């Protein structure tokens, strides 16, 4: 089973840009599944799975800001 790149986009949050790549995967039964690979930093990524690219785009739009800001807060807490 191979993934096919369907779409790429960048999301800008204040001073950071996050890369999002969307893939399509054919299942053994001929169905289609989709995944989004969100690159937050080198070696730091989040992978989402879904039934459609539209669904993944909506989930990524909500998840990316929350993830970036929570990691910023966690970094500040560790520095203090």
Sequence positions of predicted segments:
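Terminal alpha-helical segments
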Residues: 5, 24, 67-69
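Mixed-charge, Lys/Arg-enriched low-complexity segments
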Residues: 42-80
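Negatively charged, low-complexity tracts enriched in Asp/Glu with abundant Ser/Thr
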Residues: 1-21, 77-80
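Intrinsic-disorder/low-complexity loop/linker signature
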Residues: 10-15, 30-31, 51
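A short, structured beta-strand/loop element
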Residues: 19-48
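N-terminal targeting/docking segments
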Residues: 7-9, 25, 56
